Amino acid sequence: MIIWVKEVADRVTVKKVRAFVNNDAIIEPFVDMEAVGPEDCIIVSKTDNAIPSSFFVNAVIVYEDVFEAVTKNILEEVAYNYDYYYLKNALSASQNENIDTIITGSSYGIFGIDCKQLPSAVNLSLISQDMFYSIKGIYKACTLNKNIRNIVLCCSYYFFYSDLSKTQNPGELQRISKVYHPLYGDMHNCKLLPPKRNILFSSNIFDIDGIVDLYAKGKYEKSYFGNEYSRRDYATRIWEDKSKDWSELNEIEREQAGIRRAALHNKNNRWKAAFNENKQLFHELSCFCMSRDIELLVVVVPATKYYRTALCKEFREDFFEVLNEADGIVGLLDLFEEPSFSDGDFNDMDHLSESGAEKLTSAIAELLQLPVYSRP
């Protein structure tokens, strides 16, 4: 099949079309109908008033209509699979030889770190990411980049009880379908993984996958949050009036929200099998880092007093058991009760706001002696 392009200056050209079609496609400028075969197609512009009726014996594609449809499809795809494209591009960025620090963990790493301020770091954290998939990202990044010298694991005390693959929440399980299984090919302990919803068009002409990858890469700016997605949008609003921000809640509302949030996490302490598996995984990670002369730093992120006082005390004891029994060398920055973080530094009960992220990022950079972008 040959793709014939009826060129219109500054609108539709062979060069423009070539950027969007499959690499093996044959593209030629249209000259006359005699060269057009029965399986060929012709791309035209809706602004071209000189399209003979004989064109429509063949497959005719109106460039503007296809461009609009594909653009809409790609925007929908990236919005639906935002986490997948974020992590895919973060892993790609980790291959850069200037990157020597990998930051990872759950949502605490996403909310708590501003990697735009750390030119030598990449953040592989994601919302609801557990120990297993955090380590998957670490190993992949270190395989792709031998210059990695620091691993920063952002978490809370209950982290070693987490296992995303055993969740009873279908929406959370979809994270494996949409993100981790496509990237790592691993379902972990999940026995029945729900299918990933397919949004992208299929085409034997247009390189849809290449276009969406190019678009998503252009949106990646080292940070999960930006103009379209803010920390405020992702606040865990388990208080009564969802229209309120954390900063607008009164003392009673904050206390109630903190208790509810901690109660959700306290349920995790029944997952002893997950704890034992994560304990072994962390031990292996510490040995891996030590064998490669990589500094492993565990950061317990700050939390509000409303959440801290309600969190199960057993988590802290078990957390330190894991760290103390690891054979490798493990650094610890425990800021769980750090008083320099005020209520204004939080987005909700246990996630940092922009000001809180700036403080935590600076603390980690200072400890690891990482270069920091100076603000204008």
Model-flagged regions — what are they?
Residues M1-P29, T71-A79, G109-Q117, V122:
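Short, charged N-terminal beta->alpha structural module
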Residues R18-G37, Y86-L87, F132-Y133:
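A short, well-structured beta->alpha microelement
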Residues F30-K72:
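Phosphate-bearing ligand-interacting subdomains
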Residues D65-P119, N123, Y133-K140:
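Membrane/wall-proximal cationic-aromatic binding patches
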Residues I103-T104, Y108-M187:
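Membrane-embedded segments
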Residues P170-E284:
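Secreted/periplasmic serine-hydrolase-like ester/acetyl group-modifying domain
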Residues L285-L311:
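Active-site segments of SGNH/GDSL-like serine hydrolases
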Residues A310-P376:
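C-terminal regions of proteins
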